[in-house]
Each structure stands twice: as C-alpha cells, then as structure tokens.
Amino acid sequence: MAKTPVRARKRVKKQVVDGVAHIHASFNNTIVTITDRQGNALAWATAGGSGFRGSRKSTPFAAQVAAERCAEMVKEFGLKNLEVMVKGPGPGRESTIRALNAAGFRITNITDVTPIPHNGCRPPKKRRV
C-alpha cells in the first residue's frame, strides 16, 4: 500500500507591532533574541552564527552584525516598536542597540536586566596569566 505524501503546512506569519529585544552580551559572544510581548521568540541571531569565530565573536562589530541579521528576520512580522532588555557586561551592549535603532525600529525603552547576586555564590578565583 502506497503512503500518501506528507505535506508541510505553510506557517502563517502573524503581524506583531510591539516587540522585545533581549540582548545577552557576554565576554565571549552576543546573543540577540527578538520576541513578542508575551515572550514568544520571533527571531534570534548570535555573533558566532554570523560568521565570527574565536576572539572575533567578542567584538562590538560582531554584535552589530548579529543585530542586523536579527532585524532582517523580524521585518516580515511588521515590527515597529522595540523594548530593549540588555543582560551581561560584554562589549556588544551599545553597538547592538545602535544597530537595532539604525534598522528602523522605534526603541521605546532600554532596561538593564543583568543579574546581580545579593552575596550568592562565591565567584571564581582571579586569573593569573
């Protein structure tokens, strides 16, 4: 008996006007995720996934390229306004916000959500190079 071919259903692109850009800027990489207000991910991009490897991942330019790639993916959703949440101490913090602004989004709010311990775990020992 022949199997009927399975057809992939075409996903309907929902229209989202307001979104949230989550920027995770570590010392080694930058991850940009754009979600809707409820937290459902629309698109994401990283500096490493944008073609930068090794120490070049941790540059502001790599973070800028990752933000531009993420912005291009989100254009088809009709996104206009962005709220930016930045986490981490990395070098790609400011350049990512500048790239999102240059991509044509109206940035309504910038929030720093870097987790700060209230004297939690003991930090790692200092590096001796």
UniProtKB/Swiss-Prot annotation:
Pfam families in UniProt: Ribosomal_S11
UniProt key word Ribosomal protein: yes
Keywords, comma-separated and alphabetical: Ribonucleoprotein, Ribosomal protein, RNA-binding, rRNA-binding
Ribonucleoprotein as UniProt keyword: yes
Record-linked Gene3D superfamilies: Ribosomal protein S11
GO molecular function terms noted in the UniProt entry: rRNA binding; structural constituent of ribosome
UniProt record, GO biological process: translation
GO cellular component, one term: ribosome
SUPFAM superfamilies: Translational machinery components
Biological function: Located on the platform of the 30S subunit, it bridges several disparate RNA helices of the 16S rRNA. Forms part of the Shine-Dalgarno cleft in the 70S ribosome.
NCBIfam families: PRK05309.1 (NF003698), uS11_bact (TIGR03632)
Self-association state and partner proteins as the record states: Part of the 30S ribosomal subunit. Interacts with proteins S7 and S18. Binds to IF-3.
Record family assignment: Belongs to the universal ribosomal protein uS11 family.
Protein name, UniProt field: Small ribosomal subunit protein uS11
